[in-house]
C-alpha cells in the first residue's frame, strides 16, 4: 500500500514538472547569417556552430578584412611625406615668378630704386654725409658730362671738402653756367685761385650775382678774373 502511494506521488510530480517546463529552440544558422555584412570573409559560415564563439568569430572576420588595407595606407602616407619638399619647391617657384612679373611690369621704378640703394644705405649710416652728397648731386651730373674739366674740383673735394661745398653752393647763382657751360667751366678752373684772393664768401656771392652784367666776363673770363680786387669789394 505504501509503495502504491509513493508511486502515485512520483507520477504527480513528473506531470507537474512537465507542465511547467520551457522549451529552448536550437540555434538556427540562417537568421544570424542574414544579419552579417556581405563584405565579410566566407569563414562567417561557421559562426553559429557555438553561440559563445560568435563575438570572437566576428572580431576575427573584421580584422581579416582590415589588415590587408594597412600596407596600402602606409605606402600612401610615405608617398605624401616624400612629396612635401616638392610642394615647397613649387610654392617658391610660384613666388619667384610673381616677383619677376612685378619687376618686368615696373622695370623703370625698380631700376631707379636699385640706383638709389647705395644712397639709402649711406643715409642710414651717416645722415650728414648723405645730405652733403645730395647737395652735390647736380654738380656730379655736370662732372659726369665734363669729366676732364672737373678733375681739379674732384681733387679739391678730396683735399678740402668744406671749401668744395662752399664753392658748389654758389653754383646756382651763376647765370653764366646756364648760358655758356664752356665759359663757366673756364671760370670754375680759376675759382680755387680766386678763393685765396677773396676769402669772404659774401663778397664772392655778390661777385657771382654781378657776373652776368659784366661783358668782359662773358667774352673773356680769364681776363676778367685777372682784374684786381681792392678791399675785397668789386668796383
From Swiss-Prot:
The keyword Repeat applies. Zeins are major seed storage proteins. One of its GO terms (molecular function) is nutrient reservoir activity. Keywords: Repeat, Seed storage protein, Signal, Storage protein. The alpha zeins of 19 kDa and 22 kDa account for 70% of the total zein fraction. They are encoded by a large multigene family. The keyword Lipoprotein does not apply. It comes from Zea mays (Maize). This is Zein-alpha ZG99. Residues 1-21 form the signal peptide. Coiled coil: none annotated. Belongs to the zein family.
